[in-house]
A protein has these predicted regions:
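C-terminal and inter-domain tail/linker signature
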Residues: 1-133
């Protein structure tokens, strides 16, 4: 049973992120987020509308690539890459979300610029197995 809940919650987050960030279907995206979504992100205004308005203001070239995703109970954490949003560097993000009644209700994130091969002290990429060109 716990595996089913975790799998369903991971699938919900992946579908929500793809619908909002990649497909940019705002009407469909609304069904994934509570209208009263609590945002702990420094980049997003309160509520679902704050998130939708932020994305509407970004270039249509915005893309999100999910990486590792972990779920425990009502929480999902996904490590991903945002690109094409108008800055010269990509962002690597760890997003943590709480799910209630099949909707995303709370969001936290940690975001940083993606390191290049030249700037990586470890010599390892921050996302995936290879550095982006």
């Amino acid at each position: 049973m716990r595996e089913t809940i975790a799998s369903n919650n991971k699938a919900l987050v992946l579908a929500a992120f793809d619908t909002l960030f990649n497909t940019r279907d705002y009407a469909a995206a609304e069904r994934f987020w509570s209208p009263h979504d609590v945002q702990h992100s420094a980049h997003i205004e309160p509520g679902r509308d704050g998130l939708l308005n932020l994305i509407k203001g970004l270039p249509p070239t915005l893309k999100y690539e999910p990486g590792t995703i972990v779920a425990e109970g009502d929480f999902v954490i996904v490590h991903g890459r945002f690109s094409g949003f108008g800055l010269p560097v990509n962002w690597i993000a760890a997003d943590m979300l709480r799910i209630e009644n099949g909707r995303l209700v709370v969001h936290w994130d940690v975001i940083q610029d993606e390191a290049t091969r030249a700037s990586s002290k470890s010599g390892l990429p921050m996302f995936g197995d290879t550095f982006r060109a």
